[in-house]
Design a protein with these regions (language model features):
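Noncatalytic, solvent-exposed loop/strand surfaces
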Residues: 1-329
Length: 329
């Protein structure tokens, strides 16, 4: 874990937190892909093999938890979130012994893990049931009363206090990557591989709500890698063929489409009234949200970029393959 001075980019400290054995993964992945998260006291990181670690702001290791022995042919792609003193992380992996199990064939080993943020002990393990490989960072909805987490072929709502599964929707696919978005009282999810489907889900259900709580479904404009972005009243989605879709969030109607240059792994972000879309080639497109494609600017840092940018205090932080950039006025 590396601490960088946000003002000048100098390294304050660099702590070796964990060592792990090399294993299979996609070439675009790494052994430390999950984005760290902080509560202002500790910084929480998750690593390729499933180890979760906390360090304080001096770089001292506070605790480590290796409860989950994670494996996936893709590597690990989801990131942890913080909920009321808990570090919550989904682990939707596959079998070491049989490549098809968990990847192509559903199994019952996937979990959503909750750890106590103070000491790393297990609070609860939420069970998916039968599901497949996924790489989706969960979100909170319903004023924090529900945790929505998508696995390889399931989208599920959990009680963040207990880990009890409240509802579940079947969602054909595997290797699902985009995180859900929320707006207009709906949850938007995407399964971009195998049977690409974009869905809007209503809250309020219990049990299997596949037949009762899908508000609309769209087979076009399905996000495959980058996450969905909701900016009222539209949903923005980048499909596998790098076409940006603007979709009416309440109905699923496609408002406009625009083919983007380059490849897009990073998720679009919304800041200060603009949408920012970063390509693998290091080009950021700046758009005004709305009922037509309205490009404001285009900026090129000339570096390979796979990670989504962070926004803080008027600055953009971009992690490329070789550098960390701070972009500001």
């Amino acid at each position: 874990v590396i601490c960088v001075n946000r003002k000048d980019g100098s390294v304050a400290w660099n702590t070796e937190v964990h060592r792990q054995k090399p294993g299979p993964m996609r070439k675009q992945n790494s052994y430390a892909t999950p984005t760290p998260v902080t509560d202002g006291k500790y910084v929480y990181s998750v690593f390729y093999d499933g180890t979760v670690a906390a360090v304080d702001f001096s770089g001292k290791i506070v605790w480590k938890n290796s409860e989950v022995k994670f494996f996936s042919l893709h590597g690990l792609g989801a990131s942890p979130i913080l909920v009321n003193g808990q570090v919550i992380m989904p682990f939707d992996g596959s079998s070491r012994e049989e490549n098809q199990v968990g990847w192509k064939i559903p199994w019952d080993k996937a979990i959503v893990l909750s750890l106590d943020a103070e000491n790393g002990s297990v609070r609860w393990k939420g069970q998916r049931g039968e599901s497949r490989v996924g790489h989706v960072t969960p979100i909170l909805v319903d004023k924090g009363r529900q945790l929505v987490s998508a696995g390889g072929d399931r989208v599920q709502g959990f009680d963040p206090k207990t880990g009890k599964r409240i509802w579940s929707i079947y969602s054909q696919g595997e290797g699902v990557t985009p995180s859900p978005a929320v707006g207009d009282g709906l949850i938007y999810t995407s399964s971009g591989f195998e049977a690409p489907t974009l869905r809007a889900i209503r809250l309020g259900g219990k049990g299997d709500v596949t037949k009762t709580h899908i508000a609309w479904e769209q087979k076009r404009g399905v996000a495959a890698l980058s996450s969905l972005l909701y900016v009222k009243p539209y949903l923005y989605s980048i499909s596998r063929d790098n076409i940006l879709h603007c979709i009416e969030a309440s109905s699923g109607k496609i408002i406009w489409m625009e083919r983007l240059s380059g490849v897009h792994w990073a998720s679009p972000v919304y800041a200060d009234g603009r949408i920012y879309i970063l390509s693998e080639e290091g080009v950021t497109i700046v758009l005004r949200p709305g009922a037509k494609y309205d490009e404001v600017a285009r900026n090129d840092i000339g570096d390979t970029c796979l990670a989504s940018m962070a926004v803080s205090q008027g600055n953009f932080y971009i992690r490329s393959a070789q550098h960390l950039y701070c972009i500001g006025n």
